[in-house]
Amino acid sequence: MGIPCHFALFELQPGFRLDLEQLATRYRELARGVHPDRFADASEREQRSALEQSARLNDAYQTLKSPAQRARYLLTISGHEVPMEVTVHDPEFLLQQMQWREELEDLQDSADLAGVAAFKRRLKTAQEELNESFAACWDDAAQREQAERLMRRMQFLDKLTYEVRQLEERLDD
């Protein structure tokens, strides 16, 4: 028996556009049913099975709730090979990455919390635009290569957003 598709676990059709509230509600419903505590008095085999189901459910939920991870997952299940590390041949985006990194470094050096907040808002806007672009590409099977490029941009912005959150925490201390 194969591992069910993440979308199938939540009884959703595979696609990029998701109702995240519906996903969260369904996750909570399913999580209650497989929570390991419910199997405390069960056999060791049933406990292990519940733990595995819970872990698989958590992994599926984390993947689907993140636009970048959802995009990568969709590309993967559609048969589009997506290597983890790849040289990006996108000079415009590489330049943008360098500018963002320099700006983040300047914000760190100046300990500018207001500047960090403004930077974070701009990143959020850029992420939302990429999400919309990916969704449009995903709807057109002829644009899978463009969808992969957009997914890589989404992953970069996720990583940069994580670094911004870390900087905020350091500056708050």
UniProtKB/Swiss-Prot annotation:
Residues 5-77 form the J domain. Signal peptide: none annotated. It holds the Pfam family DnaJ. Keywords: Chaperone. GO terms for molecular function: ATPase activator activity; protein-folding chaperone binding. GO terms for biological process: [2Fe-2S] cluster assembly; protein complex oligomerization; protein folding. GO terms for cellular component: iron-sulfur cluster transfer complex. NCBIfam families: hscB, PRK00294.1. Belongs to the HscB family. Interacts with HscA and stimulates its ATPase activity. PANTHER family: IRON-SULFUR CLUSTER CO-CHAPERONE PROTEIN HSCB. Co-chaperone involved in the maturation of iron-sulfur cluster-containing proteins. Seems to help targeting proteins to be folded toward HscA. This is Co-chaperone protein HscB homolog. It comes from Pseudomonas fluorescens (strain Pf0-1). The gene is hscB.
